[in-house]
A protein has these predicted regions:
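Alpha-helical, largely C-terminal catalytic domains
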Residues: 1-197
Length: 197
């Protein structure tokens, strides 16, 4: 029989869909919620790991899954809010994972991610940063002017905050690929003659 705390954890995990990203305030339009952000961070981290030749995808996936879990209790704060709000993410994570079958993810995986000493932690942090850039491109496609105002700041992140060369190459490539090409160019008449057969 599963532990009660495990079931509670699953419900709390589901609440990530209700946690809006802190920077939504600045864009004035819908942005990905924490759960949506986490899914893309997992895939970005695996892509960076493969580009870097890092083989421990299990560790990377676990880190990516837990990297923002404390936000179920402390929310996600924007760069402006962080000046005034001191969220105790450590205590939130301790309480979140306490009594669950996933306690080791807090004591080991999350701690290792936050220390940023191993390559897997650096890859996940790079993925966390790159998801912001992907979403800004998507918002720009929807008509937001704010992403262009943030380009200088995001270039600084690229040059000074990204750890891996692969993440920097991905960042450089973001503007080269149209946000809509994945669906506009992928159909049985254009690129994949056998699609749908």
């Amino acid at each position: 029989m599963p532990k009660k705390r495990d079931i509670e954890f699953l419900y709390e995990l589901g609440s990530l869909r209700n946690i809006q990203r802190g920077w939504r305030q600045h864009f004035g339009m819908d942005v990905a919620n924490d759960l949506e952000h986490t899914v893309r961070v997992v895939w970005l981290a695996m892509l960076i790991a493969r580009m870097e030749g890092v083989k421990n995808e299990e560790k990377i996936i676990k880190m990516a899954l837990v990297h923002d879990m404390a936000e179920t209790r402390v929310s996600d704060h924007s760069y402006v809010q962080k000046v005034y709000v001191q969220a105790d993410e450590h205590s939130a994570a301790n309480d979140l994972f306490a009594g669950t079958s996933f306690e080791d993810l807090n004591t080991d995986t999350l701690k290792e991610y936050e220390e940023r000493q191993c390559i897997e932690a650096k890859i996940v942090k790079d993925a966390d940063n790159l998801d912001v850039d992907l979403e800004m491109r998507e918002l720009e496609q929807k008509g937001s002017k704010l992403p262009s105002k943030w380009m200088e700041n995001r270039a600084l992140v690229r040059n000074e905050k990204l750890y891996t060369e692969s993440a920097k190459k991905l960042w450089d490539s973001l503007n080269e690929v149209d946000v809509d090409s994945w669906h506009m160019e992928t159909n049985k008449w254009n690129r994949i003659p056998d699609a749908g057969k």
